[in-house]
Amino acid sequence: MSWITPDLIEILLSILKAVVILLVVVTCGAFMSFGERRLLGLFQNRYGPNRVGWGGSLQLVADMIKMFFKEDWIPKFSDRVIFTLAPMIAFTSLLLSFAIVPVSPNWVVADLNIGILFFLMMAGLAVYAVLFAGWSSNNKYSLLGAMRASAQTVSYEVFLGLSLMGVVAQAGSFNMTDIVNNQAHLWNVIPQFFGFVTFAIAGVAVCHRHPFDQPEAEQELADGYHIEYSGMKFGLFFVGEYIGIVTVSALMVTLFFGGWHGPFLPPFVWFALKTAFFMMMFILIRASLPRPRYDQVMSFGWKVCLPLTLINLLVTAAVILWQAQ
């Protein structure tokens, strides 16, 4: 058939890759909630969810059915349009953040030359969703949680971006595939160890995960900026948070641990194993660390993370200039 051209086939294959990768990310984010509950139960010497399916394997399905049939309630004096848009923006921005991550040499949704900048833009867009949710709910606890979340996210995004500049300087590109190819013989975590440490800390803070979950502190804010959400609107926030964890874990692998590079096994298997390891670390951090005060979180960011990030960037620049001579 004459209308089937090589360009059309390439477009269809690109769409297929995008759909497959994004569906896998959503599925991983959803199943991570079950894995987290089981592991936290193990660490806290209790069973965790184990009633639905073999070993609790169908607990996620039960939770989805329950959430689907929950009342989609909107507060009486809220801004209905913004209240509805907020979870959509949060979910979409976090899902699109994964689009620039190369899973294997030929599997990436969007191989952009400004890949890292695109991730930072999507992370910044998620802040608006939190602000919209807190302000439109017409609830003081929601607003306080949104203010905390926006201040924390904007602050730690500074360190998040600066911690990546050393990697960009070494690779000479913002393209994620170029950065992975630059690690064929030496992973970036060795020359950029302090950059990795600050990126990991900032990544946990941007995802609002324990111990940086002050915007959702149950003891203080009764669940923070999404206290008024129920049904599938809350589900979008809930799954979006875990998609953020998957994305940050995948970025740690891509930027600092060689991406898909590894011996014997296929590239996507290495990428999946490394990403699963860092997803597990998010759960271990939640199980083992206490929650500090909000002022301690902000003070730690500006007084510890920022100087460490700047020193790492200056040392990296000096080494690159010395090697160029």
Swiss-Prot record:
It is an enzyme of class 7 (translocase). It is found in: Cell inner membrane. GO terms for biological process: aerobic respiration. Keywords: Cell inner membrane, Cell membrane, Membrane, NAD, Quinone, Translocase, Transmembrane, Transmembrane helix, Ubiquinone. The keyword Phosphoprotein does not apply. One of its GO terms (molecular function) is oxidoreductase activity, acting on NAD(P)H, quinone or similar compound as acceptor. Its EC number is 7.1.1.-. Coiled coil: none annotated. It catalyses: a quinone + NADH + 5 H(+)(in) = a quinol + NAD(+) + 4 H(+)(out). One of its GO terms (cellular component) is respiratory chain complex I. It is a multi-pass membrane protein. NDH-1 shuttles electrons from NADH, via FMN and iron-sulfur (Fe-S) centers, to quinones in the respiratory chain. The immediate electron acceptor for the enzyme in this species is believed to be ubiquinone. Couples the redox reaction to proton translocation (for every two electrons transferred, four hydrogen ions are translocated across the cytoplasmic membrane), and thus conserves the redox energy in a proton gradient. This subunit may bind ubiquinone. NDH-1 is composed of 13 different subunits. Subunits NuoA, H, J, K, L, M, N constitute the membrane sector of the complex. HAMAP family: NDH1_NuoH (MF_01350). This is NADH-quinone oxidoreductase subunit H.
